[in-house]
Amino acid sequence: MNTNKDQEERKYPLNQIYFYLTEGCNLRCRHCWIAPKFQEKGCSYPVLAVDLFKSIVEQAKTLGLSGVKLTGGEPLMHPDISKILDYINNQDLNLYIETNGVICTPEIAQQIASCKNPFVSLSLDAADAEKHEWVRGVNGCFESALKGVKNLVNAGVKPQIIMCIMRRNKDEIEGIVRLAESLGAGSVKFNILQPTVRGEQMHKKGETLTIEELVELGAWVENSLSDSTDLRLFYDHPAAFRPMSKMFGDSGNGCSTCGVLGILGVLADGSYALCGIGMSVPDLVFGEASTDLLKDVWETTDVLNELRSGLTDRLEGICGDCLMKNFCLGSCIAQNYYKNKNLWAPFWYCEEAGKVGLFPETRMRPTVG
C-alpha cells in the first residue's frame, strides 16, 4: 500500500538540480543577479567537491531526478569539469549548461555533446565586441565567446544564445539574431535585466529600459522579428504578455516558465537553496549537503512546502488576479522574495506594467459587479 508520503513524492518529484559549481567567474558582468567573485589568474574561490556532487545526484535519483543544470559562477572553470561531465553521461541524465563560452574548448564541447540531450545557453550581449565587453567587463571575451559557440556547433550542439537587454545594447537585438544565424546557433533568448544584486544597481542608475520600452520590444520580437528568421526566438517576459500562438499549438514554444516546484539549487559551498538566490538571501538556504540528507531537505523544508501548498492561490496583487498564474507561478519567486521578503509578492514587471495600463486586460480575472 502506498503511503501519503509516497503519493506526495510523486506529486512533487525533484526533476532537476541547479548546480552552482563555482563561486568564482572569469568575467565581471555588470548585470549579474548572483554577483560571483571575479577570478583572475593567481586567485581561486570555492568550488563544489566532485564527491559531494556525486552523492547529491545519487540521492536525488531516488526522488525523481532526470536532469541537472550546471551553472555558476562559470561552470566550465571548475577544475574537475571533465570528471563531472563524464559522471553525468554515465548516469544518463539530461544536461543543461549556462556558460559565457569563453573557455569552452573543442574537448569540453565534445564531452558536452556526448551527454544525454545536451542543452547549452551561451551569453552574447551584442553583435560587436565593444558593447559585449562593456557588459561583461573583460577585454577580449567577445572573440573567445564566439570560439566557444563554434566549438559547440562543430561538436553537434546548437547552443541557445542569450542576450540580456539593457539601455546600452537595446539596438543590438536584430544584430544578435543575425549573428546567431551565421554561427549556427539553435535559438536566441532575450532576457530582461532583473533588479537583483548588480542588476538592482543598474536599475537605480537608469541603465535599464522602462516598462513601456520593454513591453514594446517584446511585441516587436514576438510579432515581427520572429517572422524574419528560422531560429526560435524567446523574449523572456511573463506568460501574460505572450501571444497564445507563441505558447501553444504546433509552432508554440511553451510558456518558458520556472519549474520552481520541481527544482533545487546546490551552491558551490555545498548548501542547498531555492536556486542561486541563496548566495544573496540566506532565508532561501535550506541546509548543507555534507550533513543533511537530500530527502529530508526536499520533504521537510518549510519554504518548499509553503510553495507547494500556496502556489498559486496565495499570489498577491496583479499576479493573484492573472489568468495565466497557473502557468506562470509568479514568474520568479526568487526575484519576488529578494525585492519584498514575501514569497507571494507580485512580479515587478507585471506590477509596473499594470501601473501604466500595459498589463493585458484579456489576461486579467474579470471583476464582478
Predicted regions and their residues:
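Residues that line or immediately flank small-molecule/substrate-binding pockets and catalytic motifs
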Residues: P36, G72, L124, I192, ...
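Short beta->alpha junction loops/turns
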Residues: T22, E74, G101-V102, D125, ...
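Short Fe-S-cluster ligation motifs
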Residues: S55-G72, L307, A345-G369
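Radical SAM enzyme [4Fe-4S]-AdoMet core and its adjacent flexible, acidic
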Residues: S114, S123-D125, E130-D292
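Conserved alpha-helical substructure of the radical SAM core
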Residues: M1-F119
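Residue-level signal for the nucleotide or nucleotide-sugar donor/cofactor binding architecture
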Residues: L48, P79, G140, R168-D171, ...
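Accessory C-terminal segments flanking Radical SAM cores
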Residues: P238-L358
